[in-house]
Amino acid sequence: GKVDCITLMNVNKEELGDHDSEDTQAVRDELERYFDRLNLKNNYSMLVVPGYLGDAETVRMWAQTAYRNKVIMLTDFKDSMNFEMLKEELDDASLQGTDPYLGNIVMTANYILGRKKSELAGEDEDLYIPASGALAGRMSNTEETVIAQAAAGKRYGTLDNVKGARMDLRKSEIAALIDLGVIPMVEEDGRTMAFSNHTLYNGASKGLQEYSIVRVFDWIGKVFENYCNDHAMEIWTPAIKSEITQD
């Protein structure tokens, strides 16, 4: 599907770990410029930061920014060569938590194939890339799939034009990664797909554990806020009541 509004920012990944850095402030200002408004019709719905942010503290900092601006943030865990290494690194990272803002962050695992190696260029390995951008593209296609439906599974989570993933994950390994809050990229039946709708939130609220539910609630909240702003300061009369009811 066509993306009508997208902003690309070239930032230094290391700078994103500093709350007060110029790059961090630039991203924050861009989000707030369209959310801290009476009219929310042009606000952002997603923030994509490809690759791993480095540690749980930085991930949480950006999750709070996403939460405050009602956007779903998509990012990735570090590239790992095998499942054992990936699981051990996820356990050590301790990314999950019960803070509500973690419900606004989606993290993929298992890098996807960007392109095959070029023998003419003397390359020895295929190029694998973070999956967050591809997943965001799948999620943005709301003409085909409503936001209440997660971009996950064989039918809705297949990534277009992606020809593979680094690790060939077994069912038990997929389940283990889902339990750790990340979204595994799975290559199966000639397709590569996202196989979870989880966020990094693992608290008692089931709604915050699934990004599709968070997206719906954030969207409804912004619609109501925009509507109320449109009718602010109006004297309540039968005519106004009738107009609002018709709207």
For the regions a protein language model found, what residue spans apply to each?
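Structured, hydrophobic secondary-structure cores that serve as assembly/anchoring elements
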Residues: 1, 39-58, 66-247
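Extended assembly-interface regions of large multimeric machines
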Residues: 1-16
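Generic secondary-structure boundary signal with a strong preference for alpha-helix termini
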Residues: 13-14, 25, 29-30, 149, ...
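A short acidic, often aromatic-flanked loop/helix-cap motif at beta-alpha or helix-coil junctions
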Residues: 13-17, 80-83
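Phosphate/oxyanion-binding active-site loops and adjacent basic polyanion-contact surfaces
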Residues: 16-28, 241, 245
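Structured alpha-helical segments in the cores of large, soluble enzyme domains
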Residues: 23-38, 55
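Aromatic/hydrophobic pocket-lining residues that form π-stacking "cages" and hydrophobic walls in ligand
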Residues: 62
